[in-house]
C-alpha cells in the first residue's frame, strides 16, 4: 500500500480550497506546500519510529482515537487555535522536529511562494492528515508498535520517489536530522502525490 497516496486521499479538494481561502493563497500554492509537507512529516515518523517505535505508535494512536480525520477543518481555521479537541498537532510536530520546525516552515514557504503563516497552516493540515491516516491503517490492520515501525520503514522507497520537483528534500532531511534516512534510497524528485 502506498501510504503517500492514502494520506492524500483524505485531503478532499474542498479542504484545500478552504485552506487557500482562509490563508489568502492560491489553491495551487497550498497544494504545493502539502505535496512537500506530507513526505517530510512521513520522513519524521519513519526516522523516529526506528528509535522510538512505542512513542510513534502512541502518537498515531492518539490521532486515530481523537478522530482527527473528521476534524481537519478545525486545523485550518485561522480564528481558532491549531488544535482539534485534545489533539494538538503542534505539540506533535515539535516532538518530531524539535527546534528545526520553524526552519521547515520557512523552507515550505519559500518553496511554494506563500506566507510563512500559510505554510504553517498547510503543514498542520498535512501533519494531522498524515498521523490520522497512519493511525487508521494501524488500527485497521491490528498493528502493534513493532508492526507499525516495520510498515513505516517499508515506505522509504515510495517516499524517496514522491518529493515534488524543486523542493530540496535531501538538504531539508539533513537540516532536520533525517539525512541518514535515505542513505540507501537516493531521492528522485517528481510530482506523483495525488493531491486534487
Task: Label each PLM-derived region with a short phrase.
Residues 1-196:
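A structural "flexibility-hinge" signal
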Amino acid at each position: 500500500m502506498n501510504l503517500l497516496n492514502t494520506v492524500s486521499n483524505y485531503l478532499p479538494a474542498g479542504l484545500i480550497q478552504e485552506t487557500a481561502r482562509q490563508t489568502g493563497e492560491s489553491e495551487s500554492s497550498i497544494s504545493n506546500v502539502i505535496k512537500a509537507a506530507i513526505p517530510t512529516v512521513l520522513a519524521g515518523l519513519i526516522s523516529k519510529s526506528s528509535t522510538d517505535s512505542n512513542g510513534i505508535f502512541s502518537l498515531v494512536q492518539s490521532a486515530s482515537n481523537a478522530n482527527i480525520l473528521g476534524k481537519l477543518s478545525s486545523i485550518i481555521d485561522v480564528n481558532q487555535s491549531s488544535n482539534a479537541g485534545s489533539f494538538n498537532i503542534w505539540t506533535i510536530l515539535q516532538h518530531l522536529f524539535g527546534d528545526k520546525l520553524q526552519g521547515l516552515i520557512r523552507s515550505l514557504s519559500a518553496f511554494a511562494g506563500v506566507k510563512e503563516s500559510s505554510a504553517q497552516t498547510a503543514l498542520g493540515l498535512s501533519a494531522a492528515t498524515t498521523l490520522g491516516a497512519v493511525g487508521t491503517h494501524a488500527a485497521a490492520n491490528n498493528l502493534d508498535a513493532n508492526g507499525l515501525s516495520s510498515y513505516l520503514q517499508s515506505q522509504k522507497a515510495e517516499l524517496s520517489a514522491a518529493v515534488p520537483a524543486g523542493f530540496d528534500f535531501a538538504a531539508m532531511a539533513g537540516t532536520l536530522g533525517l539525512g541518514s534516512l535515505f542513505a540507501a534510497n537516493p531521492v528522485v524528485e517528481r510530482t506523483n502525490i495525488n493531491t486534487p
